[in-house]
Amino acid sequence: MARPTPAPISPDELVALAMAVMKAAKFPVLATIDGDQPRARPVSPVRTDGFVVYVANLRMYHKTAEIAANARVELCYLDDKHDQVRITGVAAVLTDRAILQSIWDGNPLLRQYLGTIENPALIVYRIEPVRVRYMKEWALEYHEVPMVARVGGAALPANGS
């Protein structure tokens, strides 16, 4: 049986398709490395800016030490149509107070569970993409998603800035 050839997709359409998958798939899987063992778990992003994804965490969770030892991570989004987006990136502890405050203000669950933004258990990771790939259903081939989106003919960074 011949392998199907995926139809070409324009760069602008790839960005839109990838964003749609991210919006539909509420709980991507975050992959980290624990020594020589990969670890994966579903996460609930607290904010996305284009392909930059913010994930809240508690210091006591295993991924804290894993990311401290190796900040290279991957997020995999899978929607109900089996379309996928994979974001390969680098996780860093968020230090921008304005963004942290915005995340805190917009997330009642964080406020309920942690009580205060100053709670030392709270860490928010900013995952900066270095590569974004999209796959339509089970096409068996990923498309590279451009890191720069075009809106109305003007180039904009894929992080929405």
Where are the predicted features?
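Short, basic/aromatic recognition patches
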Residues: 4-27
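General beta-strand recognition
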Residues: 29, 52-54, 74, 86, ...
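Charged, gly/pro-rich active-site loop segments
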Residues: 1-10, 84-161
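A short, Trp-centered hydrophobic/proline-enriched beta-strand micro-motif
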Residues: 20-34, 73-77
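Conserved beta-strand in the GNAT
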Residues: 41-44
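A short mixed-secondary-structure module that forms the rim of ligand-binding clefts
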Residues: 46-82
